[in-house]
């Protein structure tokens, strides 16, 4: 894997194999039995899945050496965010997404509330 040493690759692959074994050890519940029995089996299966997910996160965070908690994203103050469509925005709906324009002063069009 790019940017990693051979030793950490082996550790990561071992961790992935362990996680795969954990998930394989908890197959889907059987569809036989009464409605209540099926419901109980599904409930217990979901609880085991949650435990396996938690264990998997702990294994990966140990191997990768970082926290599984996301790093908080610093956002600019909402009162300074404006929509800037002075450039050709297009109609695809995807252009300009991901890079908000921050203007110190709001455009006069947004402040006046009247059409010209």
From Swiss-Prot:
Domain of life: Viruses
Region (Homomultimerization): 18-26
GO terms for biological process, alphabetical: mRNA transport; viral process
GO molecular function: DNA-binding transcription factor activity; RNA binding
GO annotations of cellular component type: host cell cytoplasm; host cell nucleolus
Biased composition (Basic residues): 36-47
Post-translational modification: Asymmetrically arginine dimethylated at one site by host PRMT6. Methylation impairs the RNA-binding activity and export of viral RNA from the nucleus to the cytoplasm.
Motif (Nuclear localization signal and RNA-binding (RRE)): 34-50
Pfam families on file: REV
InterPro entries with a match to the protein in the record: REV_protein (IPR000625)
Stretches the record annotates as Disordered: 24-49
Motif Nuclear export signal and binding to XPO1 boundaries: 73-84
UniProt keyword annotations, A-Z: AIDS, Host cytoplasm, Host nucleus, Host-virus interaction, Methylation, mRNA transport, Phosphoprotein, RNA-binding, Transport
Cell compartments where the protein resides: Host nucleus, Host nucleolus; Host cytoplasm
Positions of modified residues (Phosphoserine): 5, 8, 92, 99
Subunit organization: Homomultimer; when bound to the RRE. Multimeric assembly is essential for activity and may involve XPO1. Binds to human KPNB1, XPO1, TNPO1, RANBP5 and IPO7. Interacts with the viral Integrase. Interacts with human KHDRBS1. Interacts with human NAP1; this interaction decreases Rev multimerization and stimulates its activity. Interacts with human DEAD-box helicases DDX3 and DDX24; these interactions may serve for viral RNA export to the cytoplasm and packaging, respectively.
Function: Escorts unspliced or incompletely spliced viral pre-mRNAs (late transcripts) out of the nucleus of infected cells. These pre-mRNAs carry a recognition sequence called Rev responsive element (RRE) located in the env gene, that is not present in fully spliced viral mRNAs (early transcripts). This function is essential since most viral proteins are translated from unspliced or partially spliced pre-mRNAs which cannot exit the nucleus by the pathway used by fully processed cellular mRNAs. Rev itself is translated from a fully spliced mRNA that readily exits the nucleus.
Family: Belongs to the HIV-1 REV protein family.
More about this protein: HIV-1 lineages are divided in three main groups, M (for Major), O (for Outlier), and N (for New, or Non-M, Non-O). The vast majority of strains found worldwide belong to the group M. Group O seems to be endemic to and largely confined to Cameroon and neighboring countries in West Central Africa, where these viruses represent a small minority of HIV-1 strains. The group N is represented by a limited number of isolates from Cameroonian persons. The group M is further subdivided in 9 clades or subtypes (A to D, F to H, J and K).
Protein name from the UniProt record: Protein Rev
């Amino acid at each position: 894997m790019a940017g990693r040493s051979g030793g950490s690759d082996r550790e990561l692959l071992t961790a992935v194999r362990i996680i795969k074994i954990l998930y394989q050890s908890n197959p889907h519940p059987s569809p036989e039995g009464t409605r209540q029995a099926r419901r109980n089996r599904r409930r217990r299966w979901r609880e085991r899945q949650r435990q396996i997910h938690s264990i998997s996160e702990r294994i990966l965070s140990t191997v990768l050496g970082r926290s599984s908690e996301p790093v908080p994203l610093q956002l600019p103050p909402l009162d300074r965010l404006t929509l800037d469509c002075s450039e050709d925005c297009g109609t695809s709906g995807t252009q300009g997404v991901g890079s908000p324009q921050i203007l110190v002063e709001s455009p006069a069009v947004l402040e006046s509330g009247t059409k010209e």
